[in-house]
Amino acid sequence: MKQLLGIFILAVLSLFFVAPFSYAQSKAPAGNAESSSGQAVNLTAKAAVLIEGNSGEIILEKNKDTELVPASITKIMTLTLIMEALEEGKIQLTDSVSVSEYAASMGGSQVFLEPNETQTVDTMIKCISIASANDAAVAMAEKIAGSEPNFVKKMNEKAKELGMKHTQFKNCTGLDDDIKSGHFSSAYDVGLMSRELIMKHPGISKYSTVWMDTITHKTK
């Protein structure tokens, strides 16, 4: 589990801090990350953290509290709240989720859900986990909280509960996020919510270990 968590968080951070800042990578020299053993590790990522799953000990860090745009890594918190709702019995995997006009209008990564289309919670989680689907994420936010703004409020409450001091969410997708708009997170905070998702909700591995699947569109 320690190794899996480490690999997962490093993979997450490669997307979180390399892709959104790829334009800056060539301008910024590699820098050293500080490990718990005192050994310097040369990293080109703008920020990084490696956390031991069981204890929460920081094994390696570099600019861990720097606030940066999280992009689709935002969906780690979205998935955390979905798994939480499942385990609390508020929703079931077989429940139908209706897609609103707003959810269907999401751009970016999506599975092209149509207005009034219905899918099960199980399928929506697949779409979010495998395709990073913005439309499915918003549909699930509306299913759980009634609206995306209400769901985002829950995301920020959970972030506070987890001690994520350098995070603020403005949406449940990470779509069109801008640090100036107030949507940001940090390497350490990503580590905290990744640990919460993996350690507290192991059922997510059913979805996160799948790299491809198909869905059938269902419209009324």
Residue ranges and their predicted role:
Residues G191-K220:
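Extracytoplasmic
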Residues S14-Y23:
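C-terminal segment of classical bacterial N-terminal signal peptides
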Residues M1-I7:
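Positively charged n-region of N-terminal signal peptides that target proteins for export
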Residues A24-G191, I198:
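Active-site-adjacent loops and short helices of periplasmic peptidoglycan-processing enzymes
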Residues L10-A11:
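Short, linear, compositionally biased motifs with a strong N-terminal bias
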